[in-house]
Amino acid sequence: MRVIDLTQTITENMPVYPGTEGPKLEPASTYEKDGLRETLLTMYSHTGTHMDAPAHIYDGRPTLDAMEADSFAGKGLIIDCREFGEGEEIPLCKIHAAGDLAEEADFLLFLTGWSRLWGKPEYFGNYPVLSQEACQFLIDTGKKGVGLDVISLDPIADAQLTRHHQVLAHDMVIVENLTGLEEAYEASRGGLFTLAVLPMKYENADGAPVRAAAIMEE
């Protein structure tokens, strides 16, 4: 078995969504003073590689803590979208090119290659986004969730969060700021693998950091 980490490390200087504060990692206990080390973490619920709950957008829809654990694991498939440039939409035909695998997967992950810009101002630029027709495919095929190696399912300029509204209305989850999709795509040979994206469980969770992993059977 091979496990590939798809998670960005949380640091104080990491990229965060425009308008939010970065995380704070402060020593709460030290070896010298307390005989152990403990850290006080202060951060927004949508920090780093994280998951959006339906309740992120819709009042009364499920929070992450209310969802069954099997909502966060299943068959994953990576769609290679690296040919799409800045501001381009990823069309439905790109998903159709994966054939039956796209139907069978519980989660579709979209590899744009944008994670190479993590830590640079360009990361917040005009990244490729899914077309609304592609988002509708996720709904029509009953996906558990969608994941991307960019900061949002929507363009940053879309203050209405059109795609978030479209997808989260159907109680899917969205995983943003993934990394390592290139390695996972090569390891999976473009096929299905086991995906685990387990969010922190706290009360009324509208979103949470996750530890995302692609698990390959060798």
Per-segment meaning from a language model:
Residues 1-218:
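Active-/binding-site microenvironments in catalytic and ligand-binding cores
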